[in-house]
């Protein structure tokens, strides 16, 4: 049998590896990093979203679930057990918003963008995309990018470029965006400039 505490050690290692991947993704916008998927994720919960939520959320970080996730009670049960985080119905109160697919992403105006004094009191939106293929291709610039970086993902909302430009204009306020696809993750922090590639 495994030694006592081995399960907790495995859990801690998974969380540490995913946390490191997320920090690398935030530091290098548009770069794909690998997540470690936790066990027992409900079928209705995209695995990448679960990995990010379990790693970043705790009892002090309210979570908001989109309609599809909220309609599957096992998702909220899993999150409460794995994180202790409260589930909120008001998106403006959320520290993290979990969106089952990027095309269903609500307007950023639903969420807190922080304040000039406390820009960190804003939301991080975590959403799932189907692919990193060139359904929508963009050029990224900003902190963590030496010159420009090509980034593609899809499908995305039709107004995605406009949303990101409006969000960047709020800096240092604004939302941070994390995209997952299976066990892969990309981050687009609020400091990132995004424009559609020619």
Question: Each predicted region: which residue ranges?
Answer:
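N-terminal, charge-rich interaction modules
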Residues: 1-62, 66-69, 81, 182-184, ...
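Internal, well-folded beta-alpha domain core
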Residues: 68, 73-198
């Amino acid at each position: 049998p495994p030694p006592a505490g081995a399960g907790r050690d495995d859990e801690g290692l998974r969380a540490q590896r995913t946390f490191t991947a997320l920090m690398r993704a935030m530091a290098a916008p548009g770069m794909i990093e690998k997540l470690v998927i936790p066990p027992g994720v409900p079928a209705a919960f995209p695995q990448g979203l679960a990995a990010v939520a379990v790693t970043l959320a705790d009892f002090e970080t309210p979570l908001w679930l989109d309609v599809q996730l909220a309609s599957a009670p096992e998702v909220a049960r899993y999150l409460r057990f794995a994180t202790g985080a409260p589930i909120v119905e008001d998106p403006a109160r959320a520290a993290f918003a979990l969106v089952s697919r990027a095309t269903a992403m609500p307007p950023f105006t639903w969420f807190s963008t922080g304040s000039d004094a406390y820009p960190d009191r804003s939301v991080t939106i975590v959403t799932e995309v189907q692919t990193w293929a060139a359904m929508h291709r963009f050029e990224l610039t900003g902190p963590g990018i030496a010159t420009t970086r090509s980034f593609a993902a899809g499908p995305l909302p039709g107004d995605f470029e406009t949303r990101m430009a409006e969000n960047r204009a709020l800096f240092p306020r604004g939302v941070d965006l994390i995209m997952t696809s299976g066990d892969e993750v990309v981050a687009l922090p609020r400091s990132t400039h995004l424009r559609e590639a020619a």
